[in-house]
């Protein structure tokens, strides 16, 4: 999965010196920083484009401030050190962690939004309030999100 982020950094340790001489480590660490408000920024951008923005980002779960993942050379299996491959593996792992957390936060917000809609519709039905003029979810998708009028 791709990322547009510039805050992905790498730390590469090829070998370490021991009392018995150099020892091949081949460890690559990828760190994705400054992630805490990412889900909030996405929800804020979406809600700002609503016809009547009434939802806020107060209920959006914060992400971890940073994510870390590593790849390590398996000397016993006969691996040879390849810095680019180590970076690719570490990058893939850190982005998997990040996107899993981001998706979980966005799904939780969506669940809350759907519950609000269900509770509001239930209230309006109980009190005989006509809400037929409000667009349905499918009508909103068709008219506002597909570019069609």
Residue locations for each model-derived region?
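Catalytic phosphate/metal-binding cores of nucleic-acid and nucleotide-processing enzymes, i.e., regions
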Residues: 1-149
């Amino acid at each position: 999965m791709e990322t547009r982020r510039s805050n992905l950094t790498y730390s590469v340790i090829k070998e370490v010196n021991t009392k018995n001489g150099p020892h091949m480590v081949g460890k690559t660490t990828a760190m994705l920083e400054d992630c805490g408000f990412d889900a909030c920024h996405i929800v804020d951008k979406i809600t700002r484009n609503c016809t009547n923005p009434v939802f806020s980002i107060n209920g959006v779960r914060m992400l971890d401030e940073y994510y870390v993942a590593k790849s390590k050379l398996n000397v016993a299996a006969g691996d040879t050190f390849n810095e680019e491959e180590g970076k690719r593996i570490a990058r893939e792992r850190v982005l998997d962690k990040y996107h899993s957390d981001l998706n979980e936060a966005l799904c939780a917000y969506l669940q809350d939004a759907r519950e609000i809609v269900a509770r509001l519709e239930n209230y309006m039905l109980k009190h005989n309030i006509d809400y037929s003029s409000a667009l349905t979810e499918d009508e909103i998708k068709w008219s506002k999100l597909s570019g069609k009028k």
